[in-house]
From Swiss-Prot:
The keyword Flavoprotein does not apply. This is Sperm protamine P1. Testis. Keywords: Chromosome, Developmental protein, Differentiation, DNA condensation, DNA-binding, Nucleosome core, Nucleus, Spermatogenesis. The lineage of its organism: Eukaryota, Metazoa, Chordata, Craniata, Vertebrata.
């Protein structure tokens, strides 16, 4: 029984470690992807909007 308990515990610890590593990798990948996508989308939208506004103001002034 002692040996069985030990192996078990070992398999459980291995499963937990693998699960934790996978979850961490997934969360990191999701965060990185989300940040990159959000940043690129926001940057493009903001840049385009600011450029249009700036060009309109310049054209009106000139």
């Amino acid at each position: 029984m002692a040996r069985y308990r030990h192996s078990x515990s070992r398999s459980r610890s291995r499963y937990r470690r693998r699960r934790r590593r996978r979850s961490r990798y997934r969360s990191r990948r999701r965060r990185y992807r989300g940040r990159r996508r959000r940043r690129s989308r926001r940057g493009r939208r903001r840049r385009g909007y600011s450029r249009r506004r700036y060009s309109r103001r310049r054209r009106r002034r000139y």
